[in-house]
Amino acid sequence: MSDTSESGAGLTRFQAEASEKDSSSMMQTLLTVTQNVEVPETLKASKALEVSEDVKVSKASGVSKATEVSKTPEAQEAPATQASSTTQLTDTQVLATENKSVAADTKKQNADPQAVTMPATETKKVSHVADTKVNTKAQETEAAPSQASADEPEPESAAAQSQENQDTRPKVKAKKARKVKHLDGEEDGSSDQSQASGTTGGRRVSKALMASMARRASRGPIAFWARRASRTRLAAWARRALLSLRSPKARRGKARRRAAKLQSSQEPEAPPPRDVALLQGRANDLVKYLLAKDQTKIPIKRSDMLKDIIKEYTDVYPEIIERAGYSLEKVFGIQLKEIDKNDHLYILLSTLEPTDAGILGTTKDSPKLGLLMVLLSIIFMNGNRSSEAVIWEVLRKLGLRPGIHHSLFGDVKKLITDEFVKQKYLDYARVPNSNPPEYEFFWGLRSYYETSKMKVLKFACKVQKKDPKEWAAQYREAMEADLKAAAEAAAEAKARAEIRARMGIGLGSENAAGPCNWDEADIGPWAKARIQAGAEAKAKAQESGSASTGASTSTNNSASASASTSGGFSAGASLTATLTFGLFAGLGGAGASTSGSSGACGFSYK
């Protein structure tokens, strides 16, 4: 019993000394490990205290268990050995941890001082609790000596187990500490730099994550093209460096070649050689085609010319059309005129035979053209438009009614609403929002080129035996239209002359295809009469030497040639004059009566 009491007293003294000597160092060590190793995700004091308390209580319990099983002097030395080894391992681990967490310690200096000092005070409290528990265990050991003696074979195994636990616990602790350091410690340590690196949705980005993102971005397509661009720039720099090492003679030769290439690119390319004879042959065929198509007075489409005559030579069709127009002017005294730039419609205009109406030629359709002059006069005197009701009101006074066949005009309604409209002499359109539908008549595109407002006004005033100036509004409008038409004609003639000079037309190339026998061509009697009239006009102009005399002679000769071509033409001309003046004479006589009324066309009729 006395031995037991002595051993218990010795054990108590040993525990007291160990607790006095090692408690301060162990607590400081544990405090350092707690601060450096077990750093929480955020600096929360409560979590830090819980971790430190668990670690220290486990340490204290391990020490007390070691003292319970040690009865012999060897067992008494075991706690000291265990404590020393544990202290050494802990110190080593602490040093390793301190070396790894230098950045975390430096970043923590700006943290809240209260959050840093709280673990120390709490650790002191835990140390007192651990001492109290150790003393309590010692008293329990004194009270139960029989149990200690009964378990006598176990001390060595227990001591070995405790030693093994003490040896392995720091390693596991260090491994866990490294994991925590990697996962949470760096994030918490870099909290001060999280604002500089940026946050996403409240989540801090660690240095490791930023490094991995940088490595991943360096392998992306953007980085690939950036590296390729840098290599390209490097290659260009190297090429320039190599070029700079060339001899001055080589550099001068390259400069000359570059200048020659630049000059050749700036100079206009020479046009490929053209087969003028072939082009002129196609132009002559086009002249025949135009003369035949114009007999119907329907405008000729450019698409028809390309399809029927020009065919595979579409790349040079402008020159072929221009050569055909030049031949028409020089041989026939006819101008090829494009009246619609959108639909590309062409007509033939006379340049040798001016008449009072200005309408092309003297043909078998002269009576119809006389009726057309009446319609154009009514439309112009009404303000460039006239309703269908007014037109028929005037024609009824002249004995022309819709649906009744006329000996000269046939179906009058079809003539004025279909044939004249197709020939582009008139436009026939419905009045918007009219119920029942009503229609109006306007001048067509062809009428603006074959005649003029001034000629129509003079024609109407001649019938009425009035001066054109008495119709002030119409006279002013006609004068403005004539000035505008003259300016457009001058500009068009200048542009045509430039185009022909560039194409080499009019320099004798029209004879490249050989003489063309127009008399044998299937161009109709009217075209042949125009050829004869043109030839006679040229001969008379050369003989007289005067432009005015030549113009009057060509007019008389063309009229005589047209009359001698066929008896039907002369009869048609006289019929046109009789019809035209007879119609307006009737209108004038009707206007002389007192019971007559003034119509919308400006003429007086019953």
Curated annotation (Swiss-Prot):
Pfam families reported for this sequence: MAGE
UniProt keyword annotations, A-Z: Acetylation, Phosphoprotein, Tumor antigen
Domain MAGE: 279-478
UniProt KW Phosphoprotein keyword: yes
Modified residues (Phosphoserine): S5, S157, S190, S191, S194, S197, S244, S247, S264, S265
Annotated Gene Ontology cellular component terms: cytosol; nucleolus; nucleoplasm
Biased composition (Polar residues): 79-100
Location of region: Disordered: 1-29, 52-204, 248-275, 534-563
Keyword Acetylation: yes
GO biological process, one term: female pregnancy
Function text: Regulates the expression, localization to the plasma membrane and function of the sodium chloride cotransporters SLC12A1 and SLC12A3, two key components of salt reabsorption in the distal renal tubule.
Annotated protein name in UniProt: Melanoma-associated antigen D2
Annotated organism of origin: Pongo abelii
Taxonomic path: Eukaryota, Metazoa, Chordata, Craniata, Vertebrata
